[in-house]
């Protein structure tokens, strides 16, 4: 596996409204999508940041630390490599909104993500 770049950053907060306002107004991040428990931002260069409400039922596996997503060319193959290396995997590969991703826990106990942009047809 070769990590190509940082591909995503996600964080969960108990101060959801304040954090969303901070990213939008103070940092000037563009809102790409707004859901009841998540706001997806894009930075000026297109880098994605998801801010999740701490009360959201989704992503309860997120801890207090931000989750960094590593972009790879083949998420299925990369996940298999992690499995062979004995890395703790969190669920199967998931797909949606043009991406495939898989979570894993690093030796530091933090959650990380492998992510791949899916080909468009």
Question: Model segments located where?
Answer:
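Short hydrophobic/aromatic beta-strand element in the GNAT-like acyltransferase core
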Residues: 40, 48, 69, 101-102
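Vicinal oxygen chelate
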Residues: 1-2, 79, 83-121
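Short, conserved charged micro-motifs
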Residues: 18, 75-79
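Conserved short beta-strand elements that form part of the metal-binding/catalytic scaffold
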Residues: 30-63, 111-117
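Conserved active-site alpha-helix within GNAT-family acetyltransferase domains
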Residues: 17-26, 102, 111
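N-terminal beta-strand motif that seeds the catalytic metal site of vicinal oxygen chelate
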Residues: 1-20, 65-68, 118-121
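Exposed loop/turn and edge beta-strand positions of beta-sandwich/beta-sheet ligand-binding modules
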Residues: 5, 35, 64, 98
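Short secondary-structure junctions
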Residues: 28-34, 88-93
